Amino acid sequence: MKKTICLILVALLLLGTVPVAFASHNIVIDQTWKILVPENPSAAETFAANKLASCLGEVFGAVPETVTQADEAYIAIGAASAVDTSAVADNGYRIQVINGNVHINGTAQRGLQIAVYRFLEEFCDRKVYTSKITVLPQKDQILIPADTDIVYAPFFESTDTDWRSPLDTEYSMANGLTNGSRRTLRAEMGGTVDYLGGFCHTIGGLCETEKYKDTHPEYLALHDGKRTTDQPCLTNPDVLAICTKNVLKILEEKHNPDAPLQIVSVTQNDNISNCQCENCKAFEDAHGGKASATVVNFVNQIADVVKEKGYDNVAIDTFAYYYSQSAPEGIVPRDNVIIRLCSIMCCFSHPLDTAKCNGEFYKDLTDWAKICDRLYIWDYATDYLHTCTVFPNFDVIQKNIQIFYENNVKGLYVEGNYYMDRCDTEFGELRAYMISKCLQNPYCDLDREVAGFCDAYYGPGGKYVKQIVNMFAKHSGSFDNDLHIYYGSWACMRPFTSVEARLVDGLWKLAVCAAQTDEQRSNIQRSKLSWRWWKASASKCEFSFFNPRRPEEKEKLYQDLLASGVIDFGEYTGNDVTAIDPEIIRYATPDFWHSGNTNNADCQKQMKIEKLAVAFPPLFGLVAYFYTMIHA
């Protein structure tokens, strides 16, 4: 049934996306048209009408008049429209041409705003590619098929990714990001799905483990025979009482009864020190031997109290993460509990339903989907160890989001390079846009979206960058074809032959030559930094061991990174990257630049061999090459 509903929805969406193919004729909208609103418009209707008027003003060169009465040539907004939305899902919309006029309305909190942005994108070709790049062509008129009738239901109730542009309000509105953890959208703008009291890893604070560690060590997890503040004991009734008290305190202070959904995160700390005490072990053994059993039981009891207190629009959120990833047996989450399944151990060069590398996760996904009414996902989309390198997951982004939707997932957060202001190389803006569009519609024409982005962001050279991205995707994964989020730089892509590497270099040169503005050239060079980092890590092209100028090329790469504003090479660099020992820069691969000193034994060995390779090529160059490949 789920698959059937999915296919029907996709078919309806596609019909709405390409109505021209089925139109007998078009209606023509120009600057003489008016925007029709109700006599007493709501704040949401006023916002929607103003947004539409402002953008149409940019299109036509004259802002259309907003009126409360019109007989013809109008776009009706909200309650002024005649569309029937009774069968439209919450936060969905309907855009329909009726008697030659356009009628736009939506449901629940966000539907109307989503509808206006969809109208602008679909019929005015408005695209918000980044927080700084919005494309809105000027036209004398807009053509809309006379039989247009677009009905849309959101694929997910909560969507989020970070990077840089997704933090921007207008970007979030245009591209359908709804989670409130990284953005603030006022109620009239559609609002957000808000986490109250913290987004993740909250259980230590809620259970006050530091406060009670000395007076009540039994509140702490017993792990490997020792009590630790890493996690609390989830079968201790006093711990449950403390946590419940603090959840209720958060709700007393921050709850909004008018919000459609608010979430309190009761999520395990970021470690694997789950409690192994006798009570926890017995409970887990009684539920399939799964550590998630104590987690689900714990949050279920909190959720019951929250519901009893009348917080009907509140859900309690918890993780299925590392030790709690697999679903338990004989216990199910309450209907006001969110299970947030994390894909942290997955391979990202293959779709998540690939048995060879992701079979365990996919089983966990389907198991949770069977027992959980509100399944959320925490997904990943960058190399957190070496973020400056290429992370070629481009071919799985859309497929994975489709897999989540088809397995009853209700909310999705794709964690990316959230520290992009400190480490902006690679294809951060492109990947953020790809993710956002797929969250908005997992079945969109992603190739067309990527082409449009590349043209806008990289300029005329965008077509060459797109070819490069496609080549990187084909090389995704190490020698075993896997790609994980803590891989060494060179292992993120299978080796390029010298011919292939030179071809990629040539495409970068063509892209730079085609650029028409300094901004386009800067965007190209910034993305190219990731390719240069990968080549330096894999000893390719100008970074070959057989090139005596290899140290100078690495020095140039390092200086270009600093000039581009890069002050971190990964999630946790741990040192001042502007003050790295010059010897490391010149004679070690970039993956060793994290350490910032020569104390690392492997780094010392590599530097010695590289110095010999520079002094005595080509013999030691060959030795250095094989040493690096073996020990990378």
Which residues does each predicted region cover?
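Aromatic-lined carbohydrate-recognition surfaces of secreted/lumenal glycan-active proteins
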Residues: 299-326, 375-382, 412-415
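Catalytic domains of carbohydrate-active enzymes that cleave complex glycans
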Residues: 435-630
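Glycoside hydrolase catalytic-domain groove-lining segments
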Residues: 327-334, 341-383
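Structured mid-domain segments that build the active-site/substrate or prosthetic-cofactor binding neighborhood
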Residues: 231-241, 249, 359-463
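Active-site neighborhood of glycoside hydrolase catalytic domains
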Residues: 272, 278-316, 331-337, 343-347, ...
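Feature activates predominantly on carbohydrate-active enzymes
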Residues: 43, 48-51, 55, 59, ...
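Substrate-binding cleft/loops of secretory-pathway carbohydrate-active enzymes
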Residues: 317-345, 389-393, 422-431
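Acidic, contiguous N-terminal accessory segments
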Residues: 10-99, 130, 134-149
